[in-house]
Regions:
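Conserved catalytic cysteine-centered active-site region
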Residues: 1-4, 38-63, 149-180
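Conserved small/polar residues in nucleotide/adenosyl-binding loops
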Residues: 1-9, 215-222
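Active-site-proximal alpha-helical scaffold in enzymes
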Residues: 3-25, 63-84, 173-195
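Conserved small-residue
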Residues: 7, 36, 72, 90, ...
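Beta-strand segments within the central parallel beta-sheet cores of soluble alpha/beta enzyme folds
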Residues: 19-24, 85-93, 128-135, 162-169, ...
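Condensing-enzyme catalytic core mediating Claisen C-C bond formation in acyl metabolism
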Residues: 47-123, 132, 198-201
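Short glycine/threonine-rich loop-to-helix capping motif typified by GTGT followed
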Residues: 100-109, 138-155, 174-181
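Flexible, low-complexity linker/loop segments at domain and module junctions
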Residues: 123-129, 160, 209-217, 221
Length: 222
């Protein structure tokens, strides 16, 4: 995700017309597993269907995954001149740092809320115009709870009108490739008019009361 932001800035500042951005990760190794196990971040579920279950009340950690996604970012008029197929437009981005903890975000979600609001402001979009969020949704207790708080903090009552899902429910946590793969997922969802469900999500807890697209619910098309 950081790569996409940097490359967009490079084009926006006029330093380049076309940039390649993305991420890749191959971290399922003994040291990778040992490190995240030491952090008690990995799921200990023996049932594959109940392992990576973002926003579910029985979530107990994430499942490591591997993958890669690469995108071509291009200045709009330059792309039009060469007749490029345009899949989507990257309107804005937002960054923040709550300086709370090296691995855990601020419990009130303020840092993530600031990033979302900054992205909307940069893109010239009002919060009420947004209809969908592809959440970080790692399936850890703290992330999913604090991220839900962040969405509520950023969007207020409109948070309950949003459709929210987590791609990690299907592919696990791709670490350095997560942002890039989920970026491509969002583009394809826009292109196909289809929002995938949060696979494995069966029942949420009281505070996780947003529309995170239960696995048993129909996938919306809009």
């Amino acid at each position: 995700a950081a790569s996409d932001v940097y490359k967009r800035q490079t084009i926006q500042y006029g330093d380049a017309d076309v940039m390649i951005a993305g991420g890749t990760e191959s971290s399922i190794t003994p040291i990778g597993i040992a490190g995240f196990s030491a952090l008690t971040a990995l799921s200990f579920s023996e049932d594959p269907e109940r392992a990576s279950i973002p926003f579910d009340k029985e979530r107990n950690g994430f499942v490591m995954g591997e993958g890669s996604a690469i995108v071509v970012l291009e200045e709009l008029e330059h792309a039009k001149r060469r007749g490029a197929k345009i899949y989507a437009e990257l309107n804005g981005y937002g960054c923040s740092s709550d300086a709370y903890h090296i691995t855990s975000p601020a419990e009130d979600g303020s840092g993530a809320a600031t990033a979302m609001l900054n992205a909307l402001k940069d893109g010239g979009v009002e919060p009420e115009e947004l209809t969908y969020i592809n959440a970080h949704g790692t399936s850890t207790h703290h992330n999913d709870l604090f991220e839900t708080r962040a969405i509520k903090l950023a969007f207020g009552e409109h948070a309950y009108d949003l459709k929210i899902n987590s791609t990690k429910s299907m592919v696990g946590h791709l670490l350095g490739a997560a942002g890039a793969v989920e970026f491509v997922t969002c583009v394809k969802e826009i292109q196909e008019g289809y929002i995938h469900r949060t696979v494995g999500l069966r029942e949420t807890e009281e505070e996780l009361d947003l529309n995170c697209l239960l696995y048993t619910s129909p996938s919306p098309r809009d």
